[in-house]
C-alpha cells in the first residue's frame, strides 16, 4: 500500500528539524496574515539598531510589504541577490530613510538567519478578476528564511510521478497563488 502524502510530509519535517538542525517547525503559521506578522517580527528583531528600538508602525510596514510584491520569480531573485551581500527594504520614517536588512549573505547557516518550516498553508483564492476557476489551495511544505517563503515543496507518493508535483506548482503559478508574501518563492 502506498505511503500517504501526509506521512511523507511529516517525515520530511522531522528530517529537517532533527538533531542540531537550525530549522524550526511552525505549525502556527497557516495564513498570509500569520506569515506577514512573523516576517515583521523577524525583520524588527534583526534591525533593532537601525530602528532605534522603535518597532515599525503599520504605515511603515505597508511600505515594506509593497516592496515585497514581485511581478515574477526573476524579479524576486534579482532582489534576493542583494547589494554587498545584504538584501534590504527601505522605509521612510519622518525625515529619515531606514535601510532594513532582510537577509545578510554572511549569516547564511548561522548568525541572525531564522529558518522555519510550515505545512498545509491555506492559499485562498483572492483574484476575483482571474479567468481561472476560483479555488482555494493547500500547500504541502514551504521553507521560510527570515520569515519569507523561499522554497515551496509539493510531495507525491509512489503512485504519483514527481512530475505531478511539478504540474501542481505550475497550476498554482497560473492561478496566481505565488503573490503577496509568497512572491519571493524561488
Which functions belong to the PLM regions below?
Residues 1-186:
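An alpha-helical interface "stripe"
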